[in-house]
Amino acid sequence: MEIVCEDFQKVLTKIKLLRENANIIEETVQRSVREIVQNVRESRDEALFFYTKKFDGVEIKDVRVSEEEIKQASMFVESSFLEALQEAKKNIISYHEKQKRQSMFDCTSKGIIRGQIIRPLENIGVYVPGGTASYPSSVLMNVLPAKLAGVKKIVMVTPPRAGGIDPHILVAASLAGVDEIYMIGGAQAIAALAYGTESIPKVDKIVGPGNLYVALAKREVYGIVNIDMIAGPSEIVVIADETGNAKYIAADLLSQAEHDERATAICITTNIELAKEVEKEIERQLETLPRSEIARESINRNGAIFIVPSIDEALQLSNEIAPEHLELHIKEPMNALAYVKHAGSIFLGPYAPEPLGDYLAGPNHVLPTSGTARFFSPLSVDDFVKKSSFLSYTEEALRDVKHHIVELANKEGLHAHAKAIQIRFGEEE
């Protein structure tokens, strides 16, 4: 891992280049994704079966997972796994319950009523990855907020493997309350949820992380359906001062690097000695990681340790990066929280490692990446509701303000708007 001692702007330039390189890859893949989406839109199930055989190496005739298969899945998982899943579910629910909001209205003495109705989406599709790793935790993180919001129908898609779907995924789906599960993955699954096929129902919104093909397919169908966000490769930034523990920091950086060769792992520190220790620890820990090949490629391609003169500058740099995950391994991390403007999720102190948020603590692990934490937020109950405004005026209330409406409408050249007000008071011309 490279240790960089350069000024602020040079560091930002390096990070910008990393993201631009990722965009070049995206442009190449986008053409392929567009073709897949169009074929599924036109050929429906036929295209689904074709792409499943082509990309997953599995020949299927029926994409729906049966109720019997879901029930039997519990026979193939460990009791310790089920206990961990139950604990995670409890924490996710307790955290997200506090996000629920109520419809509201206000009224005045003249009989003006204004308000907002909050309603759950009717149906959603959840994408659960199933490539180089299986993610039961993603099932809980995507489904439970939707259940709390009151979504009526939740459909899940996940790539098939030889022999079916990982039983841990099926158990998590059953525990979370998924209504229907389909063995389909990749861009073709996103297209099926967006347009519907003979087997898979069209949904109103698609959520859940996936690989580059999945992310670009979500971008392609946005507007036909709603989506949560365009999620890129995983990212972590660790800010550390001289109190940082090199073993902890290295382990946390590698926890993200092992996701994907395109993942980004950055340490920003004020202490050169700590930087050297972190570098050594990364090499040492890589030797024992089962996914060391992926993690090493990620570290070599997108990893760096930046030396800065102060924690203030470290925070400033982090705000420019706007990382998915930010860890603060510094004295009094809570005091620094107010200065963090842009980050998907923030982890304070040495005993709040990023995997705690990935699995168990309760806050959602579906987070904005690639700098989009500047304007996107973690997945929440709000993502599964929609809002409608309503208003009611009495004749007297409208009469009091009609001249303002007419003035504004005429200024915009929308005279029928003005007339719609005037006609109610015999002022037609």
Curated annotation (Swiss-Prot):
The active site is at E324, H325. Binds 1 zinc ion per subunit. Its EC number is 1.1.1.23. Zn(2+) binds at Q256, H259, D358, H417. It is an enzyme of class 1 (oxidoreductase). One of its GO terms (cellular component) is cytosol. NAD(+) binds at Y127, Q188, N211. It comes from the Bacteria. Pathway: Amino-acid biosynthesis; L-histidine biosynthesis; L-histidine from 5-phospho-alpha-D-ribose 1-diphosphate: step 9/9. PROSITE patterns: HISOL_DEHYDROGENASE (PS00611). Keywords: Amino-acid biosynthesis, Histidine biosynthesis, Metal-binding, NAD, Oxidoreductase, Zinc. GO terms for biological process: L-histidine biosynthetic process. Substrate binds at S234, Q256, H259, H325, D358, E412, H417. Its cofactor is Zn(2+). GO terms for molecular function: histidinol dehydrogenase activity; NAD binding; zinc ion binding. InterPro entries: Ald_DH/histidinol_DH, Histidinol_DH_CS, Histidinol_DH_monofunct, Hstdl_DH. CDD domains: Histidinol_dh. It catalyses: L-histidinol + 2 NAD(+) + H2O = L-histidine + 2 NADH + 3 H(+). Catalyzes the sequential NAD-dependent oxidations of L-histidinol to L-histidinaldehyde and then to L-histidine. This is Histidinol dehydrogenase. It comes from Bacillus thuringiensis subsp. konkukian (strain 97-27). The lineage of its organism: Bacteria, Bacillati, Bacillota, Bacilli, Bacillales.
